[in-house]
Amino acid sequence: MKPRSLLLATALPLALLGVIALARPDVLRSDHVGMPAPTLSAGQARPADWATPIDPQLRLYRMAPNLYRSALPDSGDMPTLQAQGIHTVINFYQRNDDWLAGSNLTTIHEPLHADRVTDTDVIRVLRAIRAGQNEGGVLIHCKHGQNRTGLMAAMYRMVFEGWSREQALAEMLGGGFGDGELMTDAVGYLNRVDVEAVRAAIDGGSCSTS
């Protein structure tokens, strides 16, 4: 490779990183903690403050009296959801919740890719959860109830319930929501997010942390 070509090959990636750092600082934050143990040890009881299983096949869990998480439901799951008093469904999957057609549930579509979630996405979703809780029970879901749902559930724990990063990650990976190897994108975001900045943005009415 000629010297000029080598210089360009080196400079262009550095310039790109500089642009990303200015436009999306949340993407380049360094990790704060390592990966916690993904499962409970043998004989260890499930922590009382972890999400409570309602329907393991659907990966439906109650996180709080008016907040639930699951994989993608279908119309056959409607009686189960109605029995929990769910009023609002927040969908992170790319497809619309067609299974809700004809129901009286409020649906909010927030399509996300776990490897591209930003602080702005999190702030918007957490506000939607809070608003929905004022009306009744809220269900958050994606396709498998793991990566995207796990990320938002962990952020809810940290921002609104004061959990530590380690506590939120431990529940996400060890709570029975699926294989932790499929949650690496969520873990990456949770390891680098500035929780205090997200909380301050929500409290201050801002749409971003920048």
Task: Report residues per predicted region.
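Short cysteine clusters
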Residues: 142
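Substrate/cofactor-recognition hotspot
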Residues: 145
